[in-house]
Amino acid sequence: MKQKVLFHVDEMERWKLLLHNVKNLLSSYDANDAGVLIEVVANGEAVKAYIQEDGNSLRNKMESLAESGVLFAACNNALTGWKIAKEHLFPFVNVVPAGVRELVDRQTEGYAYIKP
């Protein structure tokens, strides 16, 4: 059975630890495992990490994880609050209407919740 894990981040300074945790979790599964489905939900100020701009030090790590199947979601309410247009986000980021709703929905679907 595939494990389902939900990572939550709402502070910019927590991103590096979160991405490290996601990478470690992915690495802990081998070819014999059923695998893991991981979604990262950002709300609050953490949505700023999804902005495509020169010097975004998290971009390469996020892109690599996205290529490995990790899903990234941004809270539309937070984007609106910070006046960030969807067009300025990385292409692998899915915008959800409300981050807290996404967290509730995924946990109802059986996702384990982790907030580093």
Where do the model's predicted regions map?
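Short helix-capping segments at alpha-helix termini
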Residues: 29-34, 65
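Short internal beta-strands
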Residues: 38-43, 73-76
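Short, conserved secondary-structure transition motifs
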Residues: 42-50
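A cross-taxonomic marker for long C-terminal extensions/tails that follow the last structured domain
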Residues: 51-116
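Anionic, Ser/Thr-rich low-complexity intrinsically disordered regions
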Residues: 35-38, 113
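Histidine-anchored nucleotide/phosphate-binding helix
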Residues: 18-31
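Extreme N-terminal starter segment of soluble prokaryotic enzymes
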Residues: 2-5
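Short, glycine-rich nucleotide/cofactor-binding loops
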Residues: 7-19, 50-53
